[in-house]
Amino acid sequence: WSWFWYYATGKAQATVEGWRAREAKAGRIYACGSESFGGFPFRFEMNCAAASASFQSNQQPVEIKARNILVAAQVYQPTLLLSEFHGPLTVATPGQAPDLVVNWKLFQSSVRGTPSAPERVSLVLDKPVLDSVTNGNARTLLRANHIEIHGRLAEGSVLSQPVIEVALRLDGALAPDLHPATAQPVDAKIDTVLRGLNDFAPKPWHERFRQIQAAGGRIDVTQARVQQGETIAVGSGSVSINPSGRLQGQLRVTIAGLEPFLKRIGAQQIVQTSPTVDKLAGALDRLSPGLGNVARQQVGANLTAGINMIGEQTTLEGQRAVTLPLRFDDGRTFLGPIPLGD
């Protein structure tokens, strides 16, 4: 048995080196400051200290570093790779100080399949924090209690017309500077299907988006549930990428607790200062000075009632709710008539 284990470990080392050599030819360089193999008798383990990944083929070269990565597989289940990452993880232009720093309490991944033909990939993070760093000053972009991302090859293969199912789970996630809607903790369960890829070879995301658009691909949101405080939303629909590389499409969304959500995002001010209301207020002011401002106030004060009249009345999880379209129009987002931003 020991002979078999050492033989298999040697084959694993050769496989890793062969994979690194192939990736290096494409400008993707993976390295360890030091590495060791172990796990005898029932596991194969590779420990990579001072791990780094350098992507030289990107339009803007990127270097990613992590303190330590442990990869393991059971002898009796060699096509299931389990990994544990130790931070911090940094993202930087090669030779420069980090632009992004990620820390976490626990970060694990699993990959089922082979390196050339993965079937399922899962990422699980406890207490992740993503910081942007400028001139040594850190600003939190994202933090959460728990994040899970699961991907599965539903159709095709990684080399030909793959259709990818992606499931996202968020617990207590917030992005303070992204948008007023994400400044408070969010719990979410979102299941999607990505169609339109030619293959899943590593490439910059802008190239991948162009590929999806050219193939008439889309993202199907098969089911989604998002909760923030007393606001609950569920929905489904499809979104595509237009020739400008922006999102285009619509989800049908049912929302309970709409009014607190509108207050959080400042919907009243958004509507009162929209170009349409500006034109109306200007015309009314020409008829009677001050009338335009009265109209603005009425529009804002009656916003929730107006949306409830436009939307379809229903119930959601025992609460009064309204169903509205969540539209993506050339990258702009609208909840019913309310612009949410780009």
How would you name each of these model-derived features?
Residues 1-17:
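N-terminal type II signal-anchor transmembrane helix
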Residues 16-28:
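Membrane-interface amphipathic/juxtamembrane segments adjacent to transmembrane helices
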Residues 35-37, 66-76, 102-116, 139, ...:
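Extended lipid/amphipathic-ligand handling interfaces
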Residues 119-122, 162-167, 216-223:
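Short, hydrophobic/aromatic-rich segments at coil-to-beta transitions
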